[in-house]
Amino acid sequence: MIRTDAKDGALVLFSGGQDSATCVAWALERYQTVETLGFDYGQRHRVELECREGVREALKHRFPAWSDRLGDDHMIDLSVLGAISDTAMTRTIEIETTANGLPNTFVPGRNLMFMTIAAAIAYRRGLRVLVGGMCETDFSGYPDCRDDTMKALQVALNLGMDTRMVLETPLMWLDKAQTWQLAEQLGGDALVELIRVETHTCYVGERAELHDWGFGCGECPACKLRKRGYEAYLKGERVTEAPL
């Protein structure tokens, strides 16, 4: 049974990808008002931003119970982040592991900036809950995706703004198979299909071929993770019920 907490509105970090789309659905099931926030930081896979409106429209029209809950969308130009980043997410370079053990797809400070800006918007909009798709289970070791980072950031933002916001990360302890299953629990096969076809994950921005698991090059780390998770989800591997 999905829990519903309609007392507060939520602002969801929504890139146009699988994880953040699942988080939008998760928030729509819980809150009366859900707004979305995207960032254009010069990402190599900017096509994800072009998917956002299609996902939002599909959520409105295919899921009547959520239609009135989905509120405004916000898009922030954060090109300064791309300008100061020398990564495979913002440059056309090979994806590889760096000397510090992190992949060069790591954009230093990205989630910290995202959440800080989100908090400022939520403060102005009267929204108490911030929702992000950060995950510490199936991830690339990004330090700004860790649970400890999010908890520390929640404390810092509340101190700095003298407020009581909550940072929700519903995917934090889920693997990709469980993320697919969570989508099924939230919106059935219709939501799984929406996410499969309408969202974008591929780091290199490839959207020419629709695979069983969605669009993508099939070779970058993001595609491999999405593919592996989808196949495990179909087989029912590693998961009995995704925690809600």
Curated annotation (Swiss-Prot):
Co-factor note (free text): Binds 1 zinc ion per subunit.
UniProt-listed Pfam families: QueC
Gene3D superfamilies: HUPs
GO molecular function annotations of the record: ATP binding; ligase activity, forming carbon-nitrogen bonds; zinc ion binding
Annotated GO biological process: queuosine biosynthetic process
Xref: HAMAP family: QueC
Protein name: 7-cyano-7-deazaguanine synthase
Species of provenance: Burkholderia cenocepacia (strain ATCC BAA-245 / DSM 16553 / LMG 16656 / NCTC 13227 / J2315 / CF5610)
Gene: queC
